[in-house]
Every structure is written in C-alpha cells, then in structure tokens.
Design a protein with these regions (language model features):
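Post-signal/leader-peptide non-cytosolic segments of secretory proteins
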Residues: 114-117, 128
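Alpha-helix capping and helix-loop boundary segments enriched in small/acidic/polar residues
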Residues: 31, 74, 104, 140-147
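Short hydrophobic/aromatic-enriched beta-strand-loop microsegments
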Residues: 90-95, 99-100, 365, 385-386
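Long, contiguous, secondary-structure-rich segments that constitute the structural scaffold
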Residues: 121-204, 330-346, 350-536
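Alpha-helical scaffold elements adjacent to nucleotide-binding pockets in ATP/GTP-utilizing enzyme cores
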Residues: 59, 86-89, 152-155
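A conserved C-terminal secondary-structure "cap"
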Residues: 192-227
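Extended redox/cofactor-interaction regions of prokaryotic respiratory oxidoreductases
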Residues: 1-86, 94-101, 108-113, 213-355
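Short, solvent-exposed loop/turn motifs
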Residues: 90, 277, 371-372
Length: 536
C-alpha cells in the first residue's frame, strides 16, 4: 500500500541552506516564494494556522493572496482560524471524536497506540444505518459535512486519477477487494493486522479480529518496560543487505548506519553516525561547523552583550504558556477563555518606573519589523531588562458575524497602508452574543489579548534551522495615537531580516555532494539518490 520513496527533492521544504535541519523549513515558505524559488499550484494547510502561530504572519498573508506564488490554497481545519480567511477552500475536518485516527503519547516507559473513532457514525451504525463516508453520518446527525481526513485523501486520489493511469490510485485501493476503492474500515483493518506487533494474537485470544479488538478497547500495549533500546539486538531481516565497517564496527544499510557490533552482536546503538553517544560530532565538522563539534556555549542573538540597555533595548520572552490554553485550538472552550483572556506585558517595577508606566498603562513594543501595543503588568516576577508576553491570546476575525468563533476573537480592521506596510486595529473586543448556548449572552469580559507573533521576524538558527523565538525589542510608553491591540508590520523589513539570518548559514553540498547527511532521519524520506545534488 505504501508508494516507493520519491526520487525528487523539494527545496521549498528542505532548503539547501539548512542541510542539518531536523524538520522541514515550513515557516520560511513565504520568503522562499518571494525569492522566486518556486510556486505552488495548490497548498494544503492541514490543522495549521501559520498566519497566527508562525512568526511574520503578514508575509504569509501576502503569499497566500498572491496567485503568482500560491495559485490555490485549501485550509483543512477542525476549527476556523486566521489562516482560513485567506484560503480559496475551507474544508471542515473532524475533531478527535469525529474521525478515525491513531495516536500515542509519552506517558510511561512503554510503546502503545490509541485508536480514535467517530462516535456519531459508530452510534448510528449500531442503530442499523449504513454510511459510505463519515461526513454522511455527521450530516445525518446535524453536524454538516464534516469530513474525516483519511477519507478525504482517499476520495481526492481517486478523483485525481480515476482510471489509475497516473499511478496514484493503486495506493488507495482495497487490499481485500482488488481494484476497488479503499474503505476506511479496511485501511485500519490492514494496519491492525499487519503492523502492530502482538495485536492479532491478543485479538484472537478473545475471539475478535484486530479491528474489532481496537474498536472495543480503543488502545493496545505493544511493549512494556521499554528501556535500554541501544542494547536491542537487530533482527536478521533488519540486517539483510547490511555491511559492517571493520574499523568502527558500525552496521550500515543503504548508506545509513542502523547499528553497531558489540561483543559479536549487532545492536541498535544510539541514533548517531557512530551509533554511540557522541561528545565529538564528526557530522558538524564535515558540514563546515568545526567550532561546534563538541558541546559549548553559543552566544545567542539576545545575549546580554547584544542588548544595548542605553538605547532602551530589552529582551522579550514571547513563548511562555498558560496552563489553560493551547495555541489557537482552545478558542471554543468558553470556561477556559473566561479564566484566561489577557496577555499583558510583564515588566519589572524598575523598568516600569524608568518608562513612567504602571500596571494597566499602554506600552509600545518595537521589534525589528514592527510593533504591538499592549497593557503593562508590573511584577517583581520578571528580571530587570526582560519582558514577557504569553502565547495563545490575540485571536481576531475580520467580519462581525462569521469567520471565527466569538468566544475568543476580537473584531479587527486589517489593511495595507503602503506596499508591504500593514496596520491592524481592534474595532471591538469580545462581546456577549445570542446563540443556542445561553452562556454566550453572559460573557462578561471584553479583552481578547494582543497578537504579538505578527511582529516577529523569522529567525532561523543557522545550524538547526529552528526558529529562535526570543526577540530583541525596544519598549516605550504608548503615544496618544496608539490604541490597545494595535499591530504594525513592514514585510519589506521582514524579508530583509530573513536575508540577514540566511547569510549566517553554511549551505549544502556537504561531503560527496550531499544535500543532507544520509544518516539523519526525516519524514517522507526520499530515495538515497535524491540526497545528492546534481553535477560533480
């Protein structure tokens, strides 16, 4: 059922400037497109809200609304998001109880899987009703056409390749009914029968199929007391086609290390090129970072030596979380928003005195690409010279009565005042409204917070590629023209900041003309030949 690894490399996801990045460089996509590195015929944002969550969200808006960069944008989301405003298609997807899905978490030293199921579909089917798709059950139950994602991709693949001539459809055909469209129950039946060790035997002991077992219990313990994985002996099938380096004893397969010989046994070792715990990293030396081959202190962009207090510069910590909210996914939780709906700027009293502000006053926080206006909370919980503003808050919508639930969003005016220069101003905050939930008329708070992430430039670490969230800012008392919730961003400056950070990188190729070390894992790993740059 799985297609072979692709023999192509997508540089819009895995740019050659970041050969050691663990994940794709998705937050840089608007800047890659702006540079002309490519264009997208269709972009799917899947349960992803880059306009709000990512840094530099206005550059995302510019890219998503420019058909020379993104021809079409489909937003797959279980809840409305700021990104959905700038989509050609908004496709409602099911929450955890509205879809089939597999999940696991780091709860204890064990390997286990959980099986989510669309409860309304199952309930209606137990009443004798039949459905071809989960969205049909949701429509029957009054939810509307809410799809589950697995069925969407199956159906889309058959629509794109109806006769199979493109070679796509065959990966979405039933393993039990050759040539027929894969059904959602068959998809999970095959997984449970073929790729979950021990599940078929456990199910058989109760007279159940693996699928029925998971439908009954919803979870399965694959392996308990999982410790010392580096000592795990490799199986004969894992060793097939492998070679052993006579000097290092590293076991390699398809050019990548999979284990190491210890006392005559091939064991998994650690996920490094040497399969040992590495104090010295030959990879960093080979990829032209010799100064970081052993652990050491790296002076960051917000190190105190890089903060000029005489100019009013401070360090902003924008990443601390509230225990009540989750990114932009908890806006519908009315009780949680009743508890937490503000994200003031935490400021030490010494800094408040220097700025001439007290708790509740407005300050302007200036970043490299813009500013936001927020209220002050003076507290000795902060260190002088450092401010903090919590995540989660600052949700917004562009229309009064639709496009974002009203429990958590402020109505805003967003406009481009000059090319690349964007201004957002709050029209009004959260207000009571009439709905089938009587609590909506009892809303007693107005504050929706301030969207600070819009004002952050992308700051990709030159080695790992991960975004460096901490910001060097200048804080001042708000002017007479400033209003609470104001956000201003210059995307021209944002692109200049991107270029400045890009110049810090040391791009591929590496040894043997590689785009990326062969030993490093990555999602949707291409064929080995795709790792090599053309030429030479």
């Amino acid at each position: 059922m799985m297609p072979p690894p692709p023999n192509a490399w997508n540089e819009l996801m895995w740019a050659r400037e970041y050969p050691l990045a663990f994940f794709e460089m998705s937050f840089l996509l608007p800047h890659f497109l702006k540079e002309g590195r490519g264009k997208l015929a269709l972009y799917f944002s899947r349960v992803y809200n880059p306009v709000w969550t990512n840094p530099d969200g206005l550059s995302w808006i510019e890219a998503l609304t420019d058909e020379s960069k993104v021809e079409r944008h489909a937003c797959l989301t279980p809840t409305w998001s700021e990104t959905a405003w700038f989509a050609d298609y908004v496709l409602p997807m099911g929450h955890a109880s509205e879809r089939h899905d597999l999940m696991s978490q780091e709860t204890h030293a064990a390997r286990w899987i959980g099986f989510r199921q669309p409860v309304l579909r199952l309930a209606l089917e137990r009443q004798g009703k039949k459905f071809n798709f989960t969205y049909e059950a949701h429509r029957e139950a009054g939810l509307g056409e809410v799809w589950e994602e697995d069925e969407f991709w199956i159906e889309l693949s058959w629509r794109v390749d109806p006769d199979g001539s493109m070679g796509i459809r065959r990966y979405f055909e039933s393993p039990y009914r050759p040539g027929e469209k894969l059904r959602i129950d068959e998809y999970y039946r095959w997984i449970f029968e073929n790729s979950v060790p021990g599940l078929p035997q456990a199910a058989a002991s109760e007279g159940l199929t693996p699928l029925d077992y998971m439908r009954k219990y919803g979870a399965f313990l694959v392996e308990n007391d999982v410790y010392e994985l580096h000592r795990k002996v490799l199986k004969p099938e894992e060793l097939q086609g492998s070679t052993v380096d006579p000097v290092t004893q590293v076991v390699k397969k398809n050019g990548a290390p999979i284990g190491i010989q210890v006392d005559g046994n091939a064991v998994a070792g650690f996920p490094t090129p040497s399969r040992k715990l590495e104090f010295y990293s030959k990879t960093l030396k080979d990829w032209r970072w010799p100064e970081h081959t052993i652990p050491g202190y790296i002076k960051s962009h917000v190190h105190r030596d890089n903060i000029d207090a005489a100019k009013g510069e401070m360090l902003l910590l924008p990443t601390f979380r509230l225990p009540t909210l989750i990114h932009t996914r908890s806006g519908n939780a009315k009780w949680l928003y009743e508890i937490s709906h503000k994200n003031p700027v935490w400021l030490h009293p010494q800094d408040a005195l220097r700025l001439g502000v007290v708790t509740g006053d407005l300050v302007r926080v200036q970043t490299a690409i813009g500013y936001f206006v927020d209220r002050v909370w003076a507290t000795e919980g902060m260190r002088p010279g450092i401010i903090a503003c919590s995540h989660h808050l600052g949700r917004w919508r562009l229309k009064e009565d639709f496009g974002g639930e009203r429990w958590s969003t402020a109505l805003v005016d967003l406009k481009q005042v000059d090319p690349g220069k964007w201004m957002m101003r709050t029209i009004h905050g959260i207000q009571p409204f009439e709905s089938d939930d009587p609590d909506s008329s009892r809303i007693h708070w107005e504050d929706a917070g301030v969207h600070q992430n819009l004002t952050f430039p992308v700051q990709p670490d030159p080695i790992s590629g991960q975004h460096c969230w901490h910001q060097k800012v200048t804080v001042s008392k708000a002017s007479a023209e400033d209003r609470y919730g104001d956000v201003f961003v210059d995307t021209n400056l944002a692109h200049e900041e991107y270029r400045r950070w890009l110049q810090l990188t040391r791009a591929a190729p590496g040894p043997q003309n590689l785009r990326r070390p062969l030993w490093m894992i990555r999602v949707y790993r291409p064929a080995p030949e795709a790792f090599y740059l053309p030429g030479k």
